[in-house]
């Protein structure tokens, strides 16, 4: 009787220990699940806040540019932003600066290389691609495709760099290299003060290029300096104030989330439509995505 009672007690103890182990594993699983859900919820909150912060900062930037002091260009073709009307840290050459924990990069579209339109020469595009490390034969083929597509059979202008990339078979890496330097926004003037160096090299060489870079480095590139370096008089298609077309990128981070908003806009404070969005896109939503 005692042996039977002992065996029953042993079985009961095993059952209790097994039940305790199962309950322990269940509690552990619930704890891990709760932790995972909490982490995921926080990630979603951070992503939403980062996106809101980036969009709000982009809107603030738009308002600031709309209310900045503008000056009339001598060419009478556009207006420009007076450099001394904005904070000193600002620039229009895509050099990153930070304000209130948000990163900004603003590029004057007049300093970029327009993708060739119908009937236009493709040599500047080919030259730019070679500077960016793309083989000459490959660059020339892209130029040929850009020209031919707009003549026959489509007879349409290129919509963006991604369309050209698809037509010419450019890789994602090649598009990423080319994209910061080109635009499809129509521009009738060129701004050597805001142009990236590779774009400058598609228009100027030798001592002219060196002289312009020296003046720009000293913050002294204006109409008089330009004329002195190139040995020519005024040029109505050369501009020295940024605008009215601008492209900017705003990057905001909250926790592990990162949101990037990129916009291209026309800002013309004295026109009937002072603010005209051209394009906007979200580049990435988190650090992992970049």
Where are these regions (language model features)?
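Compositionally biased linear targeting/interaction segments
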Residues: 2-3, 11-290
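Glycine-rich phosphate-binding loop
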Residues: 8
């Amino acid at each position: 009787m005692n042996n039977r009672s002992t065996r029953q007690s042993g079985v009961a103890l095993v059952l209790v220990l097994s039940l305790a182990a199962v309950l322990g594993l269940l509690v552990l699983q619930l704890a891990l699940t709760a932790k995972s859900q909490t982490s995921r919820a926080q990630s979603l909150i951070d992503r939403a806040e980062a996106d809101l912060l980036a969009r709000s900062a982009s809107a603030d930037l738009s308002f600031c540019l709309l209310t900045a002091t503008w000056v009339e260009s001598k060419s009478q073709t556009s207006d420009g932003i007076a450099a001394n009307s904005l904070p000193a840290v600002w620039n229009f050459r895509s050099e990153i600066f930070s304000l209130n924990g948000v990163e900004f990069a603003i590029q004057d579209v007049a300093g970029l290389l327009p993708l060739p339109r119908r009937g236009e020469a493709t040599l500047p595009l080919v030259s730019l691609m070679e500077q960016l490390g793309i083989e000459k034969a490959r660059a020339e083929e892209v130029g040929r495709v850009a020209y031919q597509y707009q003549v026959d059979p489509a007879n349409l202008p290129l919509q963006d760099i991604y369309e050209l990339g698809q037509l010419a078979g450019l890789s994602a890496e090649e598009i990423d290299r080319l994209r910061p330097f080109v635009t499809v926004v129509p521009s009738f003037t060129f701004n050597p003060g805001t142009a990236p160096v590779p774009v400058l090299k598609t228009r100027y060489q030798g001592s002219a290029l060196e002289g312009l870079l020296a003046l720009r480095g000293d913050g002294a590139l204006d109409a008089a300096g330009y004329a002195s370096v190139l040995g020519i008089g005024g040029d109505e298609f050369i501009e020295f104030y940024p605008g009215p077309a601008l492209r900017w990128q705003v990057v905001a981070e909250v926790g592990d989330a990162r949101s990037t908003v990129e916009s291209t806009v026309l800002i013309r404070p004295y026109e009937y439509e002072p603010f005209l969005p051209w394009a906007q896109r979200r580049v990435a939503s988190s650090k992992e995505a970049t």
